[in-house]
Structures are given as C-alpha cells and as structure tokens.
Amino acid sequence: MDSAQPGMNAAQQLVVVNASLERVYEQWSRFEDLPKFIPPLRGVRRIDDAHFSYISNLNGEGKKGIFHIVLQIPGRRIAWRTISDGFMSGVVFFEPHSEKKTEVTLKIRSIFDPPNLSRRVEEYLGNFKRLVENEEAIP
C-alpha cells in the first residue's frame, strides 16, 4: 500500500472463519449487508453492478458517498475505493484454510480515523467471523 499521501494510514488484519470459502465469499459480496459487521456503515445501496452509495457515521460525523468495486474475482478477492468526499480503498482476500475454514485478509487505506484504523479493521473482521459462523447480525 502506498503511504505517500499526507494523512493516509493503512491497516491489514487476518482472521480464520469456520465456514467454507463459498459461504464466506458469498456473505462478504452481499455489499448491502456490510453494515451488519461494519458498524459505522448505516446503509449501503446498489447503484449498478460496480457502484454503491453508502451512509456512514464515524466518530459522530455523518458522511454520504459512493464506492466503486474496482476488482472482483469470485471466491478470491474484492477490491474497492471511494469516489467521493475523502479517500478510502480496500481489498479483501479469501483463501481456503481447509475444507471448512477460510482465511480472510482485509487491507484498508484511509484518511478517515487514521489513529484507530488497525483496531477498527480487526473489529470488523471479528464481527464478520461471528456473523458467518453464527449466521446472525451484529448490532
């Protein structure tokens, strides 16, 4: 990840989810469900196959924007970036750990909330793991 932009921070975390690669990828690729495990997201709505609008609230600051799916390799990788109001990009990788376990690696680069980015990425992955393994929404 390039850290040349001022105020930019990057974080990477990994989690092993006790579910098949297909189940894990399918859950993450339901972009409208991202708020179930990423609490600052209040809503995500599909615009077209590659663009989504979002509403977020991070540290009491509400934001609206659009993110673009720049790469989607089914069962392997999803990459995105925001195209409005600030900058954030990310990529999530899916690797089979065994027949019933999947390794999920999330990398994010952002100008939003840099001091806490690594902790937040870890929290989001933990929420995602619980969502998939328990098939329940995270408040």
What are these regions (language model features)?
Residues 10-12, 62-66, 87-91:
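Short, surface-exposed coil-to-beta transition loops
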Residues 7-9, 48, 61, 86, ...:
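Residue-level preference for beta-strand/loop junctions
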Residues 46-53, 72-80:
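Short, hydrophobic/aromatic-rich segments at coil-to-beta transitions
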Residues 14-18, 45, 55, 68, ...:
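Generic structural detector for well-ordered beta-strands
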